[in-house]
Amino acid sequence: MTEAAKPPTIPELEAQERRLTLPHFTYDDAWAFGNLLVELARRRCAPVAVDIRRGGQQLFHAALPGSTPDNDAWIDRKRRVVERYGSSSYLVGCRFRAKGTTFEESSRLDPDKYAAHGGAFPITVEGAGVVGTVVVSGLPQVEDHALVVEALEQFMTRPWSSS
């Protein structure tokens, strides 16, 4: 995202979530998607950690040069927001700010365990709903979110098999 680019609006974020729905999400899909996300991050020399889960199981994790253990802590906090609200962590934070408050002030959730900062996105499967999460941590929150969305958009253009 360039400095001139505006952060997405709440309606744009909601539209992203409706549009980025997968026909299925298998172990092989998680591996392919994780590798695509890592490749996009490497091209940018982005110092990020990446985490993909389905249900309670971690299916993919990578830490790129420049990332730190703190990024894994942020991943956990952002992931919990998606699991609780069923929406991207960035959208949840934006909704609180639109009400004139912050997630930390008004959610009544422990900020050591939950963070409504951009970078965590629901993995949604047609006919099943939210089945998992993809999380990136290491960039400013708008950029973490944008990287996940870009990767999902590219991932969805691939031919789908029955795997």
Swiss-Prot record:
Family annotation (InterPro entries): PduO/GlcC-like, PduO/GlcC-like_sf, YBR137W-like
HAMAP family documented for this protein: UPF0303 (MF_00761)
Family classification: Belongs to the UPF0303 family.
UniProt-recorded name of the protein: UPF0303 protein SAV_5210
